[in-house]
Amino acid sequence: MEGDYSEKYVDYINLSRLSWKRPEGPKRVWRVVDGRKKMPSGEVPRFIIQEVPESMEEELVDFMTKYFTAEETITVSQKLLSDPIAMKEIRTLWKETLRQGVSLVAIRENFESDKKSEIVGVNVLFVCTNEDEDKLTSAIEVRTRKMKTVMGTQFRLAAEVDMAKMYGVDRYLGAFGLSVNPSYRGQGVADALLQARTDIGQAYQIPATETIFTGTASQIVAARNGFEVLVERKYTEILDDEGNVAFPGVEPKFMKVMGKKLLKVNVRV
């Protein structure tokens, strides 16, 4: 087991120090939603949006590796897939984030009980409190140049947003990636995953959410689901540690930090 782990992960990224802990209890199903169009088989699919079972964690990390890393704006720009150590780092980031237990998986509802559940979408989520703000950057101790650029630029942009002042909250829901299987795009899966954050907020008293959306499509979906732009930066103005444009040649014009209130009553800080 240790050998297999070392082939896929690193041992220097650890998010166990984050202060928020999910209340004990079984994994929760947040929503069951119908797709928007027929599949080639002629049926309109139905999706279950739920918390990630431990038995599915490895498959979920593999899903993000396959789809997110290969398509996401800044990981593609940095050619993350070409760096085996950087890939171990981002896989470890996802694996560690799953510890908190609030990440979401979209599963296609299957009426044939003998078939394995099919993952169609994932949103890797975490809860960050005011006291965790500094812990987060130190806990995500990436060492490869590519991941330092990917994470460092996002941390610097996110640091321009003070969630305590912006929304009057002492904790919020953050994210480290959302991805949908290409075969199910256009079915509303990304919308359902973002909408489920409201369910999480209400159930666990998390009053707001903040996420960096790097691509045009995800920014549109976020805006459609009530997210507002808190800060944005042109990609041509985002520099790496050496002062060079961090993500040259990307198609989107802006990287955006977007947020949304999840509860009507704010938590006092």
Predicted regions and their residues:
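Conserved N-terminal entry element of GNAT/NAT acetyltransferase domains
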Residues: 2-58, 66, 267-268
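Conserved acyl-donor/pantetheine-binding loop and adjacent beta-alpha core of acyl/acetyltransferases
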Residues: 39, 75-78, 90, 95, ...
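Helix-loop element at the rim of GNAT/NAT acetyltransferase active sites that forms part
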Residues: 51, 62-80, 131
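Conserved acyl-CoA
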Residues: 161-169, 192-208, 223
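Conserved acetyl-CoA-binding loop-helix of GNAT-fold acetyltransferases
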Residues: 174-201, 224
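C-terminal helix/juxtamembrane-tail motif
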Residues: 194, 198, 244-269
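Conserved active-site alpha-helix within GNAT-family acetyltransferase domains
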Residues: 203-205, 215-239
